[in-house]
Every structure is written in structure tokens, then in C-alpha cells.
Amino acid sequence: MDNKKIVLLIIFSTSLLFLWDAWIKEQEKFNNPPAITQADSSAGSTQSRNDDSLPVPGSELTSSQASPDTNGIPASGGNGDSVTPRLLPSGEQIRVVTDKVIAEIDTIGGDLRRLELLQQPSSEDKDTPYALLYSEAARTYIAQSGLVGEGLPNHKTTFRAESDIRNYELSSGEDKIVIRLLAPEAQGVQVIKTYTFHRDSYVIDVGFEVENKGDATVRPFAYFQMLRDGNPPPAKTMMIPTFLGAAVYTEEGKYQKIPFSDLDKNKADYPANANNGWIAMLEHYFLTAWLPQQQTPREFFAKRQSDNLYSAGVIVPAGVIAPGEIAATTMPFYAGPEEQDNLEGLAPGLDLTVDYGWLTVIAKPLFRLLSFYHSWTDNWGVAIILLTMTVKLLFFPLSAAGYRSMAKLRLVTPKLKRIQDQYKGDRQRMHQAMMEFYKEEKINPMGGCFPILVQIPVFIALYWTILAAVELRYAPLALWIDDLSSPDPFYMLPLLMGISMFVQTKLNPTPTDPLQAKIMQIMPVAFSAIFFFFPAGLVLYSLVNNILSIAQQWKITKMYGTAPSKDTPEPPVSKQVNSSENPETTANSPADSPKQPQTPANNPRKMYKRTRKK
């Protein structure tokens, strides 16, 4: 049992080292992306387009074939360093403040150039709102939209605000704010671009009103895209890097991620044409997504615009507009945190953007239960404690069986040591004798390992739950723990967890191998050091789980009494395992020794009964 347990601990520790190595490599990749030649304009669309398919924005719209300077974004230098974008051309700024966001709209292109989330603190300063969209000297992440067609306005057109107001604020009694931007009339077509901000919502409706004042029918298409660089957002160090890139969802293809690296290599694979689904840009905790109405034709696209600059979006028909008629099209745009309850109600599959890794089947129910406890306590730390107690209760029968097995092993450890000493020159015979002894005493040597194996997936799933849940971002417990999603700043929880592990080792059977005994003594220190980098919420779970395990194990160990002293007479050992043994080597074997009287002192089964009666 000791050997198996050591192997499990070593495997787990090695896995953590591999994860750390992967994290280092990922950070190096982010810091030093390779220089890549200009991508083909068709990058991202993996399905051939029919003649009647929706048009894709050409170079006059997305500058996919033009010089990068067309969009105001220079190509990277020859050293392969990350691109440092120039500021995009700027016109007048329109500022909108609601109860959820602060937004800035630029009249050039009518782009949404900045969006701050009032209820989400910045990673650098808790008193500053988190900026999800921005157009700065070193970073670019904006939302663009326009119409496809000759003379129609796109994201390079200079719009004019219909109102003279440049600062809007949602006042009490108002449910929404509407911004109207007028494009210059061209070829008898008048276009008005609209933004509608809603109370208590991260959804912004972006629309176009097209009036045909000419003599010919027009058939415009509207495109909506997100443009961003490939730099990860500022965040505290995490053990495992989270996904940064695009994602698309359709009923046929389901949820698919589109890494920026695939766009760099022109190898992105996703469904381009559908009548359902959405497309998004993802980063840790937050996302932006265009959400077309169901059962309307659409074409998704994702492409590399230039070095370290990517776009993802959707194209939809804007109607068939006869002379003298007006048509309107609207596209909901979600820009906010990955709050699972809200995402589920916005669009099918949008909640899948919350990445739980390969243990989603376990992590998702864990978060549901965690949210349920939070609704009671209004404290995510207390909710984690209650979740730990629930998981411990579910595994109580398995844990009890394992601790009973370890208690029995603790009682017979001196006798096992005698068997090992007697057969130390023959490992095969020693193993056979020990297995026979386990069988006679009805002890399962692996009984203590199985509960550990079962709980490891739960531990990993909870790690991903804490890592992915924006609800735990800056969620406090008490005292110095003000962010359960980040490491303990004073390392108190990891130290307490290490102490609890040390206490657990004292309750376990002492390994007969001196090397194993030393390893077991080092393990609490090693794991404490590893947990310095883990989120405080996960360390809290481990600490509470260890405390509950210590209480359970101590109770069961007490039921079985203490281990016998080294002076306890030898137990009867198994029969002779090889009848052809040399008599000289087996003369003093336990099989030929006089039979000892069966007293409680040397009969473990009777001793168990005696301790139970006590």
C-alpha cells in the first residue's frame, strides 16, 4: 500500500511540474510570437462558398489584402516581437454611461472603441472598472460594423451624430439610450447607424436603417466584426494559461474554438455558412459575441488581418430595398463577463464559453452546487467550505473503508516488518508471504489508495471551476483573503494545509522502508510550496478536506486501538510457498515453527473485536 501511495503522489507531483512547464512555454509564446508572412484573404473560411453565398468583406472593408497601414496598424518588425499598434484614426467621441458600462463611440466608422465594465474591477487596480474594449497605443480590441456594397458606409466612413449631445447617462426612469449616427448619402441611399444601450444588460443592439431614395433596388449586406490583437489581457499569474482567441457555435458543428495560431497558419476549421449560431472573441473571464437571430442566413468569418491583429465576425442580409422603402437590421452584441446564468438565456450554447477543461461533466455540477450555497451565505468562501463538506459526505463510505484498511495496517505493521526482515533476500517470496498474510487478516492493501484516486478528478474539476468562474473573481472570504481566484498573498492557507498534511501522515501506517518514510515527511513541505501558486479557493477546499479527513481517520483509528509494540510475538505466516526449497533454508521458517496459542495478544482479529468492545 505504501508503494502504491508513493507512486500516486509522485505521479501527481510530476503532472504539476509538466503543467508548470507548459505554462512557461505558453508565456514565452505570448511574449515572443513568431513573425508570419501576410495571410491569404480567405483565411478562416474552410468551406467552399457557393455562387449565391453571402459576400465576405473585401479589402476595402477589412484591409485583409491591403497594406496594414490602411487600418492604422503597422506590420511587426523583423525581430518577431509583438506588434505595438498605432492609434486608429479618431473623430468625435460619444460617451455613454449606463448602470453596467461606460462606452465610447467614435464617429469614424461608428466603431465602439472603448467599453468599461462598472461592476468588474480592473486587474491592476480594484478601484478602476475593467476595460474590455480599448483602442490604445499598445492594445487594440474594438467592435466594428458596416454595409457591404458600392458606396455604402463601412467602418472607415465618417459618420455625423444626429444629436448635439456627446455625453449620455442613463437616468432613473429610463430603460435605454439610443445613439443615431448619419452616414453621408451616396447614390441615393441614406444610412443611419444606431446603438441601443439597455438598463441592467451587457447587450448592445447595433443596427442599420437603410432608406432607398434612388430609382434602383438595392440589396445590401451588413457585417459585424470584432478586431483585436493577440496579446493576453493583464492578469495575475495562473498555473494554467486560459484560452485567448475566437469561437463559433452552430447547431450542426456545436462549439468550436478558433485559436489565433490557426489563423496565422491559415488552418482554421469551422462552419462558415449556417442559419443559426454565433461568433465570439474570448479571453479569461470575459467575451464579446455577435448574436444573430435564429433561422436567418449568415456567414461567419475569422481571419488574420496583419501581424498580431485578428478579426472575427458575421455577415447577414440587410434586406431587399425597393425605391422609396426603408429597411432595418439589428445585431445584438454581448460584451461582458462570462456569467453562466446570464449567458444561457442569451443564445444557445453561449454558456459553453465558460471553459471547464476536459472535466466539464464534473465541474459544471460543482459550480451549480457552489452557486446554490452562495445564494444562502452570500460568501463564496463559505460556499466552498459547504461544498467541501458535501463532497466529503458523498465520499464518506469510500473514505471510511480506506481509513479502516489503514488502521488495520497500522496495527500489523510490526508483523509485516518481521516478514520483510525474514525474506529480505527473496523479494518474490516476501511478496507472496505478505499477500497471504493480508488474505488471512482480511486486509485490502489498496484500500487506502482508492478513495484518493476517486477524489483526484473532483479536485481537478474544482480547480477549473475556480479558474473559469468570473463569479469568484475578487470574491472575498474574510480577513486577508480578498480574492479566492488568486493565490493567498501571505501564504497562510498553503502553510496550514501543509500542517494538516503532516498530521495526516502521522495517522497513516509508518512505511517500513526508510526511504519511503523520508518521502512521506517531505511531501507536506513540497505540496505546501506547490500550493503557494494555486488559487486561494482551491487551497481552502484542500485545507477543509484535510481537516475533515483527519477527524474521520482519527475516529476510525481510535476504534481499532493503537499499534502493538515491537515485542509482540510473531504471527503465524503463510504456508511454505515452494515445496522444493532447500531444507536448510526453510528449517526455521514460520511454517515449521511450533504453533503459537491463539490469544488476543498475537491474534489481530481477536484484538480487533476486543478494541471494538472497548
Curated annotation (Swiss-Prot):
Signal peptide: none annotated. The chain crosses the membrane at residues 6-26, 380-400, 450-470, 484-504, 524-544. The gene is yidC. This is Membrane protein insertase YidC. GO terms for biological process: protein insertion into membrane; protein transport. It is found in: Cell inner membrane. Belongs to the OXA1/ALB3/YidC family. Type 1 subfamily. It holds the Pfam family 60KD_IMP. Residues 34-48, 60-70, 575-602 have a biased composition (Polar residues). GO terms for molecular function: membrane insertase activity. Required for the insertion and/or proper folding and/or complex formation of integral membrane proteins into the membrane. Involved in integration of membrane proteins that insert both dependently and independently of the Sec translocase complex, as well as at least some lipoproteins. Aids folding of multispanning membrane proteins. The lineage of its organism: Bacteria, Pseudomonadati, Pseudomonadota, Betaproteobacteria, Nitrosomonadales.
